[in-house]
């Protein structure tokens, strides 16, 4: 019987060759377009009224 430690290098080698062979024949093109529009309107109105009345 083989142990997991003995089987792992063989599996890694098989996967390595499988992916390296696919990498030479596979072309992937990804295009991402992101549009962000932010509109912020801030209106601040401050009114201060002071009335002074003096009576003699």
UniProtKB/Swiss-Prot annotation:
Its main location: secreted. Keywords: Glycoprotein, Secreted, Signal. Glycans are attached at residue 22. The keyword Secreted applies. One of its GO terms (cellular component) is extracellular region. Residues 1-25 form the signal peptide. It comes from the Eukaryota. It is found in: Secreted. This is Putative uncharacterized protein DDB_G0275629.
